[in-house]
Amino acid sequence: MLPLLLASSSAYRRELLARLHLPFTWASPDIDEQRLDGEPPVELVRRLARQKAEALAGSHPRHLIIGSDQVAVLGEQVLGKPHTFERACEQLLECSGQQVSFLTGLALLNSATGQCQVDCVPFTVTLRELSREQVERYVAAEQPLDCAGSFKAEGLGVSLFQSTHGCDATSLIGLPLIRLVDMLTKEGVMVP
């Protein structure tokens, strides 16, 4: 088996990948994550996932490189990482009582052959009706400033949900393991 490399500095993605009990290393790719003019969100996350994997291919020949990227979408609006307390509160108040789609792009690049599998795994969350006080308490408690949509589904963020819908709950955290296992299997990796 070629060595696995996770093209991410995200602790959340490392924790998810560790669930597969496969040895792996990780490195942070340096790419421009700006959305292209008119680029649909699905194509954005697919492109960025692939670019993250490709960015590390030169320094990691003969690896299986996993790239992933996620955006939250409310209607037609792409919600990025809020980075500030105020913006996180604004995002959550905008999403209150609404359905938010999380699109997670996934790429598995075999840097020895150049073959790359790419997909987008959607997951939908309907948020409860939230008051400003609830939102501010949540953001203060969990500090979801580096999370698309301003919440951490793997933590207290689940308390904001009214319902969820999707094929792979791990995609909500940023690395869709069910789809990744399919991709790894096509590369001859046995899981479990």
Curated annotation (Swiss-Prot):
Catalytic class of the enzyme: hydrolase
GO molecular function, one term: nucleoside triphosphate diphosphatase activity
Catalytic center residues: D69
Recorded catalytic activity of this chain's protein: N(7)-methyl-GTP + H2O = N(7)-methyl-GMP + diphosphate + H(+)
Cofactor(s) needed by this chain: a divalent metal cation
UniProt record similarity statement: Belongs to the Maf family. YceF subfamily.
PANTHER family linked: 7-METHYL-GTP PYROPHOSPHATASE (PTHR43213:SF10), BIFUNCTIONAL DTTP/UTP PYROPHOSPHATASE/METHYLTRANSFERASE PROTEIN-RELATED (PTHR43213)
Name this polypeptide is given: 7-methyl-GTP pyrophosphatase
